[in-house]
């Protein structure tokens, strides 16, 4: 394997992406106590995923067939492509509700820090903390009712 700057960058990016996947899918459900509710949310950036995976595919094809670059770079690009295909198309964003707070976008928000909640007409639950505004885009009305029931029970 050739360890030039490109391969080092791709290797670090692949490791960080794998750590993100493991944290999101394995660590969050197990940390901070029992999971009360896990709700899949509406996806909002589907086209971003298409563009990003398309760029990775173009880089792979360019490196493999046109530039005849190092094989190690092609392997690292292929691994990155597989990881991002999983992230963009198979994994969905979710809110994980625990007994003491909720996980959203990899961060934990205790129920005690929530100052205000608003519900929009199109099914968006807006949660305001002292520093941030979280927008939970529920997939269905039933999911929204489940989230509100958890908030009324545990906050």
Swiss-Prot record:
Q: Which Pfam families match?
A: DUF986 (PF06173)
Ordered alphabetically, the record's keywords are: Cell membrane, Membrane, Transmembrane, Transmembrane helix
Q: Does the keyword Nucleotide-binding apply?
A: no
| TM ranges | 8-28, 46-66, 70-90
InterPro entries annotated for this entry? DUF986
Subcellular localization(s) per the UniProt record: Cell membrane
Q: How does it sit in the membrane?
A: Multi-pass membrane protein
- Give the family from UniProt: Belongs to the UPF0266 family.
HAMAP family given in the database record:
UPF0266
Protein's name according to its UniProt entry: UPF0266 membrane protein lin0773
**Species annotation:** Listeria innocua serovar 6a (strain ATCC BAA-680 / CLIP 11262)
């Amino acid at each position: 394997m050739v360890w030039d700057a490109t391969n080092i960058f791709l290797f670090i990016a692949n490791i960080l992406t794998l750590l993100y996947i493991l944290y999101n899918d394995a660590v969050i459900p197990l940390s901070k106590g029992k999971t009360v509710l896990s709700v899949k949310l509406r996806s909002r950036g589907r086209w971003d995923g298409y563009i990003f995976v398309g760029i990775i595919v173009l880089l792979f094809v360019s490196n493999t067939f046109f530039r005849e670059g190092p094989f190690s770079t092609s392997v690292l690009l292929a691994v990155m492509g597989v990881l991002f295909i999983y992230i963009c198309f198979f994994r969905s964003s979710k809110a994980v509700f625990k007994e003491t707070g909720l996980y959203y976008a990899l961060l934990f928000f205790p129920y005690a820090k929530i100052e205000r909640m608003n519900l929009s007409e199109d099914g968006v639950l807006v949660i305001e903390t002292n520093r941030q505004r979280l927008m939970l885009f529920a997939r269905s009305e039933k999911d929204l009712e489940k989230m509100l029931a958890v908030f009324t029970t545990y906050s």
